[in-house]
Curated annotation (Swiss-Prot):
HAMAP family: Urm1
Subunit structure: Interacts with cer.
Modified how: C-terminal thiocarboxylation occurs in 2 steps, it is first acyl-adenylated (-COAMP) via the hesA/moeB/thiF part of the MOCS3 homolog, then thiocarboxylated (-COSH) via the rhodanese domain of the MOCS3 homolog.
Transmembrane segments annotated in the record for this chain: none
Principal localisation: cytoplasm
Keywords from the named record: Cytoplasm, Isopeptide bond, tRNA processing, Ubl conjugation pathway
Protein name from the UniProt record: Ubiquitin-related modifier 1 homolog
Stretches of the chain forming a coiled coil according to its record: none
UniProt crosslink position (Glycyl lysine isopeptide (Gly-Lys) (interchain with K-? in acceptor proteins)): G104
Modified residues (1-thioglycine): G104
The protein's role, per its UniProt record: Acts as a sulfur carrier required for 2-thiolation of mcm(5)S(2)U at tRNA wobble positions of cytosolic tRNA(Lys), tRNA(Glu) and tRNA(Gln). Serves as sulfur donor in tRNA 2-thiolation reaction by being thiocarboxylated (-COSH) at its C-terminus by MOCS3. The sulfur is then transferred to tRNA to form 2-thiolation of mcm(5)S(2)U. Also acts as a ubiquitin-like protein (UBL) that is covalently conjugated via an isopeptide bond to lysine residues of target proteins such as Prx2/Jafrac1, Ciao1, Eip71CD and GILT1.
Pathways per UniProt: tRNA modification; 5-methoxycarbonylmethyl-2-thiouridine-tRNA biosynthesis
GO cellular component: cytosol
Length: 104
């Protein structure tokens, strides 16, 4: 919770096709972020790494972004069309991470 009258920023995170295995096998999370700061996907990825990424971070994060093979959809739109890491999150955004990396 933030310390002033600025509301928290509520967003929904979803994980699919194996990505959920890296996040405690939880497919959907509703999270509240500090509404006093600007939240981009870049900030969100850092927050996720520090707070909810529980298994093998190298399979999800590469440098400051997601690994190749992780699709990111924001409100059902490919993040590449929305500015990728620079996209500024808005209240009730739905961010879906889909793993296309499968062994065989």
């Amino acid at each position: 919770m933030s310390n002033n009258n600025t509301p928290d920023l509520k967003i929904i995170l979803e994980f699919s096709a194996g990505a959920e295995l890296l996040f405690g096998n939880i497919k959907r999370r509703e999270i509240c972020l500090d509404g006093t700061q600007k939240w981009t996907i870049a900030n969100l990825l850092k927050w996720m790494h520090a707070n909810i990424l529980t298994e093998r971070p190298e399979l999800f994060i590469q440098g400051d972004t997601v690994r190749p093979g992780i699709l990111v959809l924001i409100n059902d739109t490919d993040w590449e069309l929305l500015g990728e890491l620079e996209y500024e999150l808005k209240a009730n955004d739905n961010v879906l991470f889909i793993s296309t990396l499968h062994g065989g």
